[in-house]
C-alpha cells in the first residue's frame, strides 16, 4: 500500500533520496515507513505551521491589522516580499500570505500582532512545542529563516496532527494561489508546493521549506483518505525532487 500512496503523491523519488522522512497513518495512529525520524535539524519555513497555530490561539482581535516595517525585513537570507511596506494589512491576509506563499515578512509581522512582543510570541511557540510533546523542537523566529529553528520528522508529525484542528490552516494549505488584499491592492501569490499549485493532490496540511542549512522540507497530509487512511508525509531532502 505504501508504494501506491507515495506514487500517487508523486514523491517516490524524493523519499528515496531523503535524509530523514516519516510516512504516518493518522487514521490508525502508526508509522508506515521511516528513515532517521528522530534526526534533529533545521526545518526552515515548516516553522510557519507553529506560527499559524500560536497566532490563531492567542490573537483576540478578529479585525487586527499590521504593517510590514523595517523590523520585519529579512536580514538573515535577504529574501523579499511582494507585499507593500508600511501599509496596514489585515492579519487574516498576512496569515494567507504566510501559509500559501510562505511570506517571511508576513510571518514576522504576525509575531508582533497577537497582543505580545515578538520575543513573547517565540516563547509561546516553544511552550506549545513542549505542550505537544515535541521534545526535539526549538524555535528562535517565526519565519524559519534562522537555522536555530530545529525539529525532527517525528516531532513534526505531532505538529501536523495538531494543525488539523485549525480550519484556517487546512483551507489555506490547499489553495493553489491567492490574492492578498493589501493597501487597496490585490497581490497575486502562488502556493510554494507544486503538488497543490498544479492541483495534483488535495492537501489537508501542506507546508514547504528551504534554507541551505536544512535542505528541502515538506509536511503534507492528504485531504482525502487513501485506502481509508489519512497519510502524513514529512521529509527532508538535499534536492527539491
Show the residue positions of the predicted features.
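Sec-dependent N-terminal signal peptides
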Residues: 4-13
Amino acid at each position: 500500500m505504501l508504494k501506491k500512496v507515495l506514487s500517487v503523491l508523486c514523491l517516490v523519488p524524493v523519499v528515496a533520496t531523503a535524509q530523514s522522512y516519516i510516512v504516518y497513518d493518522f487514521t490508525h495512529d502508526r508509522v508506515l515507513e521511516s528513515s532517521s525520524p528522530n534526526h534533529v535539524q533545521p526545518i526552515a519555513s515548516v516553522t510557519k505551521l507553529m506560527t499559524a497555530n500560536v497566532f490563531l490561539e492567542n490573537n483576540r482581535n478578529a479585525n487586527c491589522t499590521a504593517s510590514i516595517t523595517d523590523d520585519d525585513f529579512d536580514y538573515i537570507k535577504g529574501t523579499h516580499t511582494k507585499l507593500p511596506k508600511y501599509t496596514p494589512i489585515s492579519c487574516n491576509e498576512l496569515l494567507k500570505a504566510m501559509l500559501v506563499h510562505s511570506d517571511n515578512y508576513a510571518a514576522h509581522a504576525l509575531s508582533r500582532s497577537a497582543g505580545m512582543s515578538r520575543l513573547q510570541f517565540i516563547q509561546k511557540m516553544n511552550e506549545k512545542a513542549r505542550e505537544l510533546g515535541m521534545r526535539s523542537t526549538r524555535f528562535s523566529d517565526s519565519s524559519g529563516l534562522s537555522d536555530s529553528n530545529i525539529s525532527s520528522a517525528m516531532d513534526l508529525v505531532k505538529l501536523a496532527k495538531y494543525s488539523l484542528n485549525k480550519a484556517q490552516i487546512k483551507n489555506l494549505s490547499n489553495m493553489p494561489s491567492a490574492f492578498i488584499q493589501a493597501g487597496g491592492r490585490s497581490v497575486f501569490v502562488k502556493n510554494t508546493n507544486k503538488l497543490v499549485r498544479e492541483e495534483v493532490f488535495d492537501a489537508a496540511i501542506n507546508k514547504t521549506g528551504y534554507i541551505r542549512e536544512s535542505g528541502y522540507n515538506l509536511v503534507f497530509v492528504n485531504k482525502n483518505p487513501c485506502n481509508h487512511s489519512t497519510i502524513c508525509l514529512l521529509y527532508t531532502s538535499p534536492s527539491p525532487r
